[in-house]
Curated annotation (Swiss-Prot):
Record-given protein name: Asparagine--tRNA ligase 1
Organism of provenance: Lactiplantibacillus plantarum (strain ATCC BAA-793 / NCIMB 8826 / WCFS1)
Keywords (A to Z) from UniProt: Aminoacyl-tRNA synthetase, ATP-binding, Cytoplasm, Ligase, Nucleotide-binding, Protein biosynthesis
Keyword Nucleotide-binding among record annotations: yes
Signal sequence interval, chain numbering: none
Location of the protein in the cell: Cytoplasm
InterPro entries, per database record: Aa-tRNA-synt_II (IPR004364), aa-tRNA-synth_II (IPR006195), aa-tRNA-synth_II/BPL/LPL (IPR045864), Asn-tRNA-ligase (IPR004522), Asp/Asn-tRNA-synth_IIb (IPR002312), NA-bd_OB-fold (IPR012340), NA-bd_OB_tRNA (IPR004365)
SUBUNIT field: Homodimer.
GO annotation terms (biological process): asparaginyl-tRNA aminoacylation
Gene name linked to the record: asnS1
Known catalytic reactions: tRNA(Asn) + L-asparagine + ATP = L-asparaginyl-tRNA(Asn) + AMP + diphosphate + H(+)
Top class in the EC scheme: ligase
Main location: cytoplasm
Domain of life, per lineage: Bacteria
Amino acid sequence: METISIINAADHVNEQVKIGVWLSNKRSSGKIAFLQLRDGTATFQGVALKNELGETAFAQLTDLAQETSLWVTGTIHADTRSPFGYELAISQFEVVGTSHDYPITPKDHGIDFLLDHRHLWLRSSRPNAIMRIRNEVIRAVYEFFNDRGFIKIDAPILTGSAPEGTTELFKTDYFGQDAYLSQSGQLYGEAGAMAFGKIFTFGPTFRAEKSKTRRHLTEFWQLEPEMAWMHQDESLEVQEQLVAYLGQAVIDHCPHELAVLDRDVATLQKYTKLPFPRVSYDDAITLLQANGFDVDWGVDFGSPEETFLAEHFDQPVFVLNYPKAIKAFYMQAHPTRDDVVIAADLLAPEGYGEIIGGSERSTDYDYLKERLLASGQDLQDYEWYLDLRKYGSVPHSGFGMGLERFLAWITLQDHVRETIPFPRMLHRIYP
């Protein structure tokens, strides 16, 4: 008799197997019991008959509490009525770990209660489906970039400078020096691009933002490619190809998870159609003003403006060439306009706003020094970064994509906290 995982049930129809499971739920009519069993790979139904198990064993089985762990032995049968397509006719079982008063029951719970019990909530069907989609997106990220000749480099988490030049930093003592939890791996990524041509960093980043919006976490994962010898137009092509690739990967490999989340696949499929529309910041301002928005040139867009623009185009949309005053110091100046930089944000529809921000990077040593000084930065902190412009600088571009924002859009979640295993937010660092 073989020990299998539920996900492989199709390969063992009409065979007797053994599976290690947790009991998610159960119901019994007195002579027959239906048990929802999960093993981490999938969930399906186990069926136990009183006249086959015997009265004592049947009573013990039907008395088991939610989240009891056990070995079950039985025969796999195809079942077209089951969402999974298969069920287990249980002939034997062995309790491994008991469970008493499991706090997350089928009834509704408030979000604070669920987050306090996140270590257990991950077992429930919706969080479980989201984490599986997260895993698929991460897998597809590596596949996308590896297939295109990118090298992954690992940027440090502890840094002595801030790439965005902000004050939203987690500060710590580093043997008598000030150090910060990284907000971005981008500057190190640029160094990597000068060594390897095309690179990506992918890891946790930290923002000490005292924000309670549905789009912010204090710790999140960010994907940041940097590409030498590449201008902005070419970078935009990489960005839209990436989004379409990741969306298609989820459609192809996570149909059950999308069904659990009630995510419409046809809508997702529409978002894989390329190219994405492009609109200049100037034209976006004009469009917003024509539709009743009180916005002036030079402001950064908030959630209402981003939502309108993406819904107007009914697709992810690139907004190009933002005002220099609202963008980071490292962005390439526009060739004909002093007030604009060659930057772009990708806005997702359905109210999710910016999911990618990118730009062509400045290659001008003196311009970068001027921008750093204007933002109040200490040039000594950035000496190594400025060195990149002194020794064979080339045109290069890059972008950043927040994994959790992307996942919130793909899985249609109201808050990014749903898309990371253990969210870190203002006033929440437990569990």
